[in-house]
A protein has these predicted regions:
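Short S/T/G/P-rich N-terminal loop/turn motif that feeds into the first structured element of a domain
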Residues: 1-192
Length: 192
């Protein structure tokens, strides 16, 4: 990972990132041997991401990409957009978690999420998003950031009201969605 990090640092530090965009390298928290170990995230507004894609060309990019391909393999490509973001801090991020779903009724699922978040108060920010393309038919995700390991390990309902809100969310969404699993990441470096 160190070699790839150096290649990424050399390339992404040498270009002027478009307004509002960032690229980050994240490590999967406790990935199994032989499974993906890192994720590259490209974040920003659509126009910024299109401009960033245009910058990813030329001799410098070709050299970077050739170097990365010696040590890394693309196993999946996903894209999505935030539908609802619950305010919270996204500074000093220790880690993040993404829960993936196949949703049959996005209006009901979204309403259940908003209802849950009126009661549940996490320390970091939480968002509901929609995959615009993925790999296994997943349609939506819930994404949460944590400012330290304790917040990540203690995530979940803390009060009777929060427990009740989670139970309502699961009872309202279980018939209209299928949970695909989750992944937890920790940041390695971000360029913006």
């Amino acid at each position: 990972a160190g070699y790839v990090l150096n290649l990424m640092d050399d390339f992404y530090s040498s270009i002027e990132m478009p307004e509002g965009t960032s690229v980050s390298l994240e490590a999967l928290y406790h990935s199994a041997e032989g499974s993906p170990s890192h994720i590259m995230n490209f974040i920003g507004p659509v126009d910024g991401l299109i401009a960033l894609r245009a910058l990813r060309s030329g001799d410098a990019y070709d050299a970077y990409n050739t170097g990365v391909e010696k040590f890394a393999t693309i196993l999946s490509i996903k894209a999505g957009k935030t539908l609802a973001r619950i305010p919270g801090t996204d500074e000093n991020v220790f880690g993040a978690q993404e829960w993936s779903f196949n949703v049959k009724d996005q209006v009901k699922f979204g309403a259940a999420f908003v209802e849950l978040m009126k009661v549940f108060k996490p320390t970091g920010y939480v968002s509901l998003g929609q995959y615009t393309h993925g790999e296994k038919g997943e349609t939506h995700y819930i994404y949460s950031m944590y400012n330290d390991q304790a917040a990540m390990l203690n995530f979940g309902p803390k009060t009777e009201a929060e427990i009740s809100a989670f139970n309502k969310f699961f009872s309202k969404t279980s018939a209209i969605s299928e949970y695909n699993g989750s992944r937890t990441t920790v940041p390695v470096k971000t360029w913006n």
